[in-house]
Design a protein with these regions (language model features):
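Single conserved hydrophobic/aromatic residue that forms the stacking wall/gate
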Residues: 1-7, 12
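A cross-family kinase active-site recognition segment
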Residues: 14-69, 88-90, 119-120, 371, ...
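Helix-rich C-terminal or lid/interface subdomains of diverse kinases
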Residues: 21, 25, 86, 129, ...
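Active-site Asp-x-Gly
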Residues: 90-92, 105-158, 388-413, 420-427
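Catalytic-loop of the protein kinase fold
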Residues: 92-94, 99, 356, 360-377
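Juxta-kinase regulatory segment immediately upstream of eukaryotic protein kinase catalytic domains
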Residues: 208-241
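ATP-binding glycine-rich loop module of kinase domains
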Residues: 241-243, 249-291
């Protein structure tokens, strides 16, 4: 069973950066195999054939009543670079090779479909549809180019691709007219975007292009790093089935399975791609979180099993918690989450209230607590809180100016150097979380899905004036429960 790469739960935009890039690499390698089939010897010379095609498109564009803003840049680039067509090879072409004609199998394999427009021509001309890929997923598009050329992309390719895209874009506007204004507007916007990528056709390398990640594999799972690192020690925790490599904290995380049990391993010490600091500092920070997880044990907090120095770094091992993160940075999971019944979301919020009451009762304050810290098991209806690494003991003062966390969940004092960060701050956090759960992050009455009374309570909680908020988590909880 396959799912289309766009427009499904396994949509490319819902994949991690690494997954998008790796799928692109595979798409490029598949295309290279397709292009291994030569064209018949009787095929018309490519230079003659494509020049005729471009002349026709220029003529139709000039006659078209609708013009692109600075569309002349496409024509000028074509006329200045026709010589690039000389002596180009010809091969079998898929004919419509782009992200919409690919599918992902249940096992994660990439498949190419819809060969009904197959043709013969310059293999590099086949990339002209990459415009659609780059608009939806630049990392996928970059991977496709890098995979095709084994990370050694010649400049001549970029110059020719710009020629082919110029030709293709010219024809799009007059092609769209019979389909109505919406289709015309789509092509006008696309042309504007293409011109921005190429600096009005002055730079043949588009701005969306990314030279790629350093990829490493563990148990067949790809992940990105700055440079190679020995993860052989991970065998101690079983087989890796998932890698989380997008953190900017210096940590990299793994889902593992051993003897029928699953674990979540958080490791510091590797040269992670998103982290700009010293791995030694990441190790120190991760070690400092150990007492936090020990002090704040709660039925909804992810369960810490062990922590130790290993593999020239430091690892914390947790019991695996099934579920999806409710954060908007995970679009597929978020869409599922906002569709669950209100009563289930109320139960999630009740779990969050209980956990934050536990936090303040043990003389801590929640910092960097946001939707990305909340997981929900859709099968068993269980809430799990994770990633509390930056919680602090009271008293706490803002010593950063702009503290760690998502601005959608942060109180004004979390942006004010020297301000107290305390239980009243976490009342604001609760209010912001309620708006995320029951208002789709919007703080207007129109979007609010519960009663007027509950809306008033939550609006007080997110007041910029600390004195107007509920002064304790317990006060907020009492008001919330009384109003339900």
């Amino acid at each position: 069973i396959c799912a289309c790469l766009v427009g499904s739960e396994m949509c490319i935009r819902d994949s991690s950066d690494t997954e998008q890039y790796v799928y692109g690499l595979e798409a490029g390698r598949i295309l290279r195999k397709i292009h291994s089939i030569p064209a018949p010897a009787t095929q018309e010379d490519w230079e003659i054939r494509f020049n005729r095609k471009m002349d026709y498109k220029i003529k139709k564009y000039v006659e078209c009543p609708i013009k692109y803003e600075n569309g002349q840049a496409f024509i000028d680039y074509i006329n200045e670079n026709r010589h690039l067509l000389k002596n180009r090879p010809q091969v079998y072409q898929h004919g419509d090779y782009h992200i919409g004609n690919m599918m992902i199998g249940r096992g994660g394999q990439l498949h190419v479909i819809d060969f009904n427009r197959n043709d013969y021509g310059d293999p590099w001309e086949e990339f002209n549809r990459i415009v659609w890929c780059a608009q939806k997923a630049p990392l996928f598009a970059s991977g496709m180019v890098n995979g095709y050329f084994d990370d050694n992309v010649p400049m001549e390719f970029w110059r020719l691709l710009a020629l082919y895209i110029s030709s293709n874009t010219l024809s799009s506007v007059y092609w769209a007219i019979p389909f109505g204004q919406d289709e015309v507007n789509t092509m006008l916007n696309q042309a504007k975007e293409v011109l921005s990528w190429y600096d009005n056709m002055r730079n043949p390398v588009p701005t969306w292009y990314f030279k790629g990640y350093y990829l490493q594999y563990i148990d067949g799972i790809p992940f990105k790093l700055k440079s190679t690192f020995d993860f052989s020690f991970m065998k101690e925790y079983g087989t890796v089935f998932k890698v989380y490599d997008d953190q900017d904290s210096g940590n990299i995380c793994f889902g593992t399975e051993k003897d029928g049990q699953r674990y979540f391993v958080k490791f510091a010490g590797a040269p992670t791609e998103q982290y700009g600091g010293d791995p030694a500092d990441a190790i120190s920070r991760l070690k400092a979180t150990l007492p936090i997880y020990s002090d704040l044990k709660h039925e909804n907090l992810i369960e810490l099993i062990e922590a130790k120095e290993i593999g020239d770094g430091f690892a914390m091992v947790f019991k695996w918690a099934d579920g999806d993160c409710m954060g908007r940075m995970y679009p597929a999971a978020y869409r599922r989450f906002i569709q669950i019944p209100i009563n289930d979301r109320l139960a999630v919020f009740s779990d969050i209230l209980s956990f934050l009451e536990c936090v303040v009762s043990r003389n801590y304050v929640a910092i960097d607590f946001y939707d990305g810290s909340i997981m929900y098991d859709f099968v068993n209806g269980k809430t799990t809180i994770c990633d509390i690494d930056l919680f602090r003991k009271q008293p706490c003062v803002n010593d950063m100016g702009h503290m760690w966390g998502s601005s959608r969940f942060q109180s004004p004092e979390e942006h004010q150097l020297g301000a107290d960060i305390d239980e009243i701050t976490n009342v604001y956090t609760l209010g912001a979380t309620a708006f995320a759960l029951f208002g789709e992050y919007n703080r207007t009455r129109e979007k609010w899905q519960l009663s007027d009374k509950l809306f008033e309570i939550v609006t007080r909680a997110v007041s910029d004036d600390r004195a107007n908020r509920q002064q304790t988590i317990r006060q907020f909880t009492a008001e919330w429960e009384a109003a339900q």
